[in-house]
């Protein structure tokens, strides 16, 4: 876990680029290799699928990999929560990953399946010393409030997850307090302003989060490098949201807009 959550400050900046496993090509991540290359230097770890790891990450780069191993559904299917484990522990070892990631859907039709998936994955990982990150995915019918997220995070930890990724909410400190393993926050959908995403990161850390696993709010920004630098200044540099936003604005004045933004116009 020390490769995921830095022991110097017990925090992490994880870059999420696993969205294609259910969303397909997405603005900002249409060409994963291009997106990842520009941001790699500023992330503590990458969360991605084995397909993107094989095709889009330079194997010479030494960065901790959080491998998404749950899937089997898509945005056009009937129920995103009907996920299975889609990669073996042997494959994870071959790919030299640092951590395994899997979604759970507490309260959904497939709650039992995804929770037993988590238990099985923890058992698989324990045999080889590979920790597991549980993602508390939220279905359309579920509220992102502290009661629900606190329940989901606690269950994930009780099932053996070593770290939990969840959403920020009101009374988030209660969610963290009730979870005996580190909690990192998801960035979620792209917010309208970079300042909002930076405030989200800052508030979560103030309420006890151990870091962020952010994707769309970084690589869907017109200035993704400046954005990840600003996020990093909050997580590891103890900047507040205003200081981080000023750093973002300064960087965006000299950063060339991302190619995906140019292509889409």
PLM feature segments, named:
Residues 205, 220-259:
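C-terminal helical cap(s) of enzyme catalytic domains, especially alpha/beta-barrels
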Residues 141, 172-175, 249-262:
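Flexible glycine/acidic-rich beta-alpha junction loops that bind and position SAM and/or redox cofactors
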Residues 7-185, 191-214, 233, 241-243:
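Alpha/beta enzyme core
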Residues 217:
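Catalytic grooves of carbohydrate-active enzymes
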Residues 1-6:
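N-terminal basic/disordered segments at the start of proteins
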């Amino acid at each position: 876990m020390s490769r995921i959550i830095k022991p110097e400050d017990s925090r992490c900046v994880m870059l999420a680029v696993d969205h294609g496993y259910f969303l397909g090509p997405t603005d900002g991540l249409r060409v994963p290799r291009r997106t990842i290359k520009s941001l790699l230097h500023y992330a503590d770890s990458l969360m991605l699928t084995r397909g993107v790891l094989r095709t889009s990450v330079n194997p010479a780069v030494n960065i901790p990999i959080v491998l998404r191993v749950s899937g089997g559904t898509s945005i056009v299917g009937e129920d995103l929560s009907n996920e299975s484990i889609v990669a073996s522990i042997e494959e994870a070892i071959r790919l030299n990953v640092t951590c395994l990631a899997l979604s759970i859907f507490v309260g959904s039709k497939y709650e039992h399946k995804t929770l037993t998936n988590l238990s099985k994955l923890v058992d698989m990982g324990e045999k080889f010393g590979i920790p597991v990150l549980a993602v508390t995915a939220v279905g359309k019918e579920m509220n992102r409030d502290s009661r629900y997220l606190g329940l989901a995070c606690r269950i994930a930890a009780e099932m053996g997850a070593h770290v939990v990724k969840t959403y920020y909410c009101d009374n988030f400190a209660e969610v963290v307090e009730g979870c005996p393993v580190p909690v990192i926050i998801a960035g979620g959908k792209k917010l309208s302003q970079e300042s909002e995403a930076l405030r989200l990161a800052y508030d979560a850390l103030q309420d006890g989060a151990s870091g962020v696993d952010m994707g769309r709010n970084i690589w869907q920004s017109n200035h993704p490098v400046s954005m990840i630098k600003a996020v990093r200044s909050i997580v590891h540099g103890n900047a507040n949201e205003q200081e981080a936003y000023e750093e973002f604005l300064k960087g965006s004045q000299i950063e060339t807009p991302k190619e995906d933004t140019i292509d889409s116009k």
